[in-house]
Amino acid sequence: MRRFSVFLVVFVVAASFACGGSPSNPSGTGTLNVRLTDSPFSDAGAVLVTFRGVRAHRSESDWAPVPFADTTAVTRTCDLKKLENGAVDILGSGPLVTGHYTMIRLVVESAKIYQAKSPAGPACASSITIAGEEGINVQIPSGEVKLNRGFTLEADATTTIELDFDGDRSIRETGNGVYTMNPVIAILSVTPSTPPQP
């Protein structure tokens, strides 16, 4: 009788694996795009801001990194002057586990102000160089910015978040040619896409 019971248990377990197939990820992944634009800023030819990281906070979980658009780069630099008047560029984009997210966190590593304009090309890149001018380093007391805005990432769907980096309110001249930055960034919109129908 005992041997029959053991056999029955083994048979039931084996049958459940056969019916269920291989284990699958119950949550899946979706894609998060983080785009950047800038309010008008008129006191410079170029304002290069370098980001060290973009992260999203998942409910009841931890911070998840959002890859930069250039996935091989550890930083991403954007010229705020090229992001004025409705222009946008991708800051980060990549797959994240599905679920409800509560916050976006940005880390601004450095910033420089130039009188000359940056060369032709995209507003954001892994690096941007302006030849013939050293630029003015901007002091950043705290480069970490947390943005509270909930959104839900669905499986096989894309959610796009558009951020406004207000350069005019972020940068202040304190005298003697010294500039400081306290990043003022707001979420303009969160646009989810509909996942494909089976």
Across the structure, where does each feature detected by a protein language model lie?
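C-terminal motif of bacterial Sec signal peptides marking the signal peptidase cleavage site
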Residues: A15-A18
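A short, solvent-exposed, low-complexity linear motif enriched for acidic/polar residues
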Residues: G20-P198
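Bacterial N-terminal signal peptides that target proteins for export
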Residues: M1-L8
